[in-house]
Design a protein with these regions (language model features):
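AlphaC helix of the eukaryotic protein kinase fold
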Residues: 43-64
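Conserved short submotifs of the Hanks-type protein kinase catalytic core
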Residues: 82-96, 100
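Activation segment signature within eukaryotic-like protein kinase domains
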Residues: 115-116
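Conserved catalytic-loop aspartate of Hanks-type protein kinases
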Residues: 193
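Protein kinase glycine-rich loop
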Residues: 14-20, 25
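Protein kinase catalytic-loop region centered on the HRD/HxD motif
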Residues: 119-131
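A short, aromatic-enriched beta-strand patch in the conserved N-lobe beta-sheet
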Residues: 76-78
């Protein structure tokens, strides 16, 4: 089934760039300034308080961080006539790092490290603003027109406040990059983001997420949950300090894990 027809005053919809379980992303032209943008339209209407909270959470989180060089800027947001929410973001013609891994495999170690440093800086800035991302993965790291990388999709983002609901269903997780405690519905924390960040850097280095077989065999959720408890095995050819940082950031138990994205960056 194709995406629903979308019309938005002030924008010319050009083509579908991608479609996932919860949203469709279009290439569009912002007529007032003649700028090409990415228009992300949710496939669900804002019919429940939970849906409205989710959308406001994403917009607020992304808006707080839009000035960061490694966060995709948000230009506009709102609700269509049929109650589907939308966001207008910077168009990143280089696609995602997930796309690149699929096409080319692992990245050179220096490039993976440099990308990791930039993303860690973005995550540290998010945490300093009280924002958790909760879905860091190569598919949510975009490459802009200048070749820079930036984190996008704060759809699961949470801003911790006393009494606020922070839970998320298993169906909304990306199992290969989610921290082990997320499968047991533990409260999200900065340590969870650090795990997902480290898992993303690991995938850039190896071409696959942590604990995944080299032959590409798919794992069931039950198998992955068990493998998440396995200790980190050093990657050959990496400087000892790099392996140490990954080992500390990928610890299965949050209490034993590096929880400061700034420290991981260093």
């Amino acid at each position: 089934m194709g995406p629903e027809r979308t019309d938005l005053p002030g924008y010319e919809i050009q083509e579908v760039l991608g479609q996932g379980g919860f949203a469709t992303v279009y290439r569009a032209r912002q007529l007032a300034v003649g700028r090409e943008v990415a228009l992300k339209v949710d496939s669900r209407v804002l019919s429940t308080p939970r849906d409205r909270q989710r959308f406001l959470r994403e917009v607020t989180a992304a808006g707080q961080l839009s000035g960061h060089p490694h966060v995709v800027p948000v230009y506009d947001a709102g609700v269509l006539a049929d109650n589907r929410p939308y966001m207008v973001l910077e168009l990143c013609p280089g696609g995602s790092l997930g796309d690149r891994l699929h096409r080319q495999g692992a990245l050179p170690a220096k490039e993976a490290r440099d990308i990791g440093v930039g993303l860690a800086d973005a995550v540290a800035a998010a945490h300093a603003s009280g924002v958790l991302h909760r879905d860091i993965k190569p598919g949510n790291v975009m490459v802009n027109r200048y070749g820079g990388v930036a984190l996008t999709d704060f759809g699961l983002a949470a801003m911790p406040r006393p009494g606020r609901e922070l839970s998320v269903t298993r169906e909304a997780l990306t199992p290969a990059y989610a921290p082990p405690e997320a499968f047991h519905m533990a409260d999200p924390s900065p340590a969870g983001d650090v795990y997902s960040l480290a898992a993303t850097v690991y995938a850039l280095l190896c071409g696959r997420p942590p604990h995944y077989p080299e032959d590409g065999t798919q794992l069931s959720l039950a198998e992955l949950i068990v493998r998440h408890t396995w200790p980190y095995a050093d990657l050959p050819g990496l400087p000892p300090a790099f392996n140490t940082a990954l080992r500390h950031a990928l610890a299965a138990a949050p209490a034993h894990r590096l929880s400061d994205a700034g420290a991981f960056r260093e």
